[in-house]
């Protein structure tokens, strides 16, 4: 279902010149389409909220639509929020579908598996950003800072498409940084959105998965 067909979507998006004004309460949430309710045999709008639910994982079997879902996420965020409100980064170890957004003002970059130097610089930058925000927030967290000061620094979303492939191709080089992001990122306004086949030794490992509050499940081979 195209987002344009969702009720109210076109009333609250970029009109070609300005983004809609932010609400009084800080929020970072977008609709992604419809989800099934098997019990009532119906469908309902699917909305995800980073501000309420922190990191997200999108799990499903091969060709279940995980990359398309990440594309929809980027599209929705770019149209609903200004670049001053949210910054996006993509790490695409799948089908390079995030390349469509490289020129968007919100997007700091999309990194592919052969961009080893760019990858190193990115994760170093994220470590520095967490330290910088730790000093800035003075013991508080991102939502508290925004309530007191407004959105002076943007929220950051790091999307990783095909987490298992990312781990394998980088030989788990960035596992420590990922653990830091998973554990402390939400407090600094830095959120993860990762796609995977599920949770486990070769997919999203426990020490990362324990910090992911929300899982959106597409078609699965088996229960995870």
Task: Label the predicted regions.
Residues 11, 16-143, 147-223:
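P-loop NTPase catalytic phosphate-binding loop
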Residues 6-9:
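Interdomain helical linkers/hinges and coiled-coil/dimerization scaffolds
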């Amino acid at each position: 279902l195209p987002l344009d067909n969702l009720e109210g979507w076109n009333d609250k998006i970029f009109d070609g010149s300005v983004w809609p004004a932010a609400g009084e309460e800080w929020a970072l949430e977008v609709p992604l389409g419809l989800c099934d309710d098997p019990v009532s045999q119906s469908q309902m709008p699917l909305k995800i909220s980073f501000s309420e639910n922190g990191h997200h994982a999108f799990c499903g079997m091969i060709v279940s639509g995980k990359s398309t879902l990440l594309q929809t996420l980027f599209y929705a965020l770019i149209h609903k929020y200004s670049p001053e409100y949210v910054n996006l980064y993509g790490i695409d170890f799948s089908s390079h579908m995030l390349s469509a957004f490289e020129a968007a003002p919100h997007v700091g970059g999309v990194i592919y598996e052969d961009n080893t130097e760019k990858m190193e610089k990115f994760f170093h930058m994220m470590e520095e950003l967490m330290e910088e925000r730790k000093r800035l927030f003075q013991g508080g967290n991102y939502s508290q800072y925004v309530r007191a000061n407004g959105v002076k620094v943007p929220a950051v979303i790091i999307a990783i498409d095909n987490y298992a492939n990312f781990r394998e191709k980088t030989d788990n080089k960035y596992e420590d940084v990922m653990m830091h992001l998973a554990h402390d990122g939400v407090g600094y306004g830095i959120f993860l959105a990762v796609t995977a086949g599920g949770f486990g030794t070769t997919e999203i490992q426990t020490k990362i998965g324990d910090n992911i509050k929300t899982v959106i499940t597409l078609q699965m081979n088996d229960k995870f």
